[in-house]
Amino acid sequence: MTKKPWERRLKDLSHLLKCCIDTYFDPELFRLNLNQFLQTARTVTFIIQKNKNQIIGYDIWYNNNVIEKWKNDPLMAWAKNSRNTIEKQGDLEMYSEAKATLISSYIEENDIEFITNESMLNIGIKKLVRLAQKKLPSYLTESSIIKSERRWVANTLKDYELLHALAIIYGRMYNCCNSLGIQINNPMGDDVISPTSFDSLFDEARRITYLKLKDYSISKLSFSMIQYDNKIIPEDIKERLKLVDKPKNITSTEELVDYTAKLAETTFLKDGYHIQTLIFYDKQFHPIDLINTTFEDQADKYIFWRYAADRAKITNAYGFIWISELWLRKASIYSNKPIHTMPIIDERLQVIGIDSNNNQKCISWKIVRENEEKKPTLEISTADSKHDEKPYFMRSVLKAIGGDVNTMNN
């Protein structure tokens, strides 16, 4: 089969998602595009079913990749029910709101929200600023942020902002078609837009901004997308990868962490550093998304890990691996100082992985710096069990992929 009609329909769906983004603040046009998106999403699987006689192994593939994967997915159930509502009863009931959120830690349950209409948003932000100044210790206020956004919410899906919900639905459809392309040995074309390619547009459409309380500066999350191209990878990097033996078949999070740790160690020893990297992977332990990032302060870390949680939902990740250089600081339980002011007692390179079943492994090395002229070296690695290492900063992502966040509590 050379032509894939379901893939053409998926491209239509990506266009409609872009239209929803572009018309987010035009209620009438957004309503029209939302309706058409939900109706078109349903037809992707209809077209696959229509062509089932041409798909070898269709029954097993469809059961594993559609029926089983979506049967307990509340968003896919909502999409199906919403299509029926649109076709038989009329438009979905939805409303717009403005929301300001005070974020002072990695723990989402500690957030304080102020939900109102758009004209009152600035008042809400001022109230949260005063609340933070009055109630939070100074060492927390310094790293706190206020996230403000405008959003559409459906009466039948109150826990999701609508654009985020549509992105997840598109991601499910994209993964379905991608899996089918592998099944028939005819991979998906590069011209089909990946779900994560819309991320920057989502933030822009929802007018998301972050107010840092340490200096009252306004920030936005910014990033660029780079498509993988084997031709542009330098030869020395390819040779470096050959130094690390890749297992023929990785079957666990622990094995994936072991292999990734070897790559990270080789990279650090060659370059003298390692960029902070987040990798999402699927149930077959194949990487499906990779993000490099930098942080200016503690507030940036809060922003990043909330964003990473949203991205994990869109990609339907099974697990994730985080590679970073980190400082260990001497902290007291009763300390009332910001983290960045605490004395540094050690420096490490760390690779940690965890999946939705809470299988976890962490490997770290002590970074040794003789002087500024020489590249740093690494002391022998140590492996930690999940009982030893509690990376609570990852809890929002673990929650997003369905893991037990209680394992992150000390």
Curated annotation (Swiss-Prot):
Protein's gene: ea47
Source species: Escherichia phage lambda (Bacteriophage lambda)
Lineage: superkingdom: Viruses
Name of the molecule in the record: Protein ea47
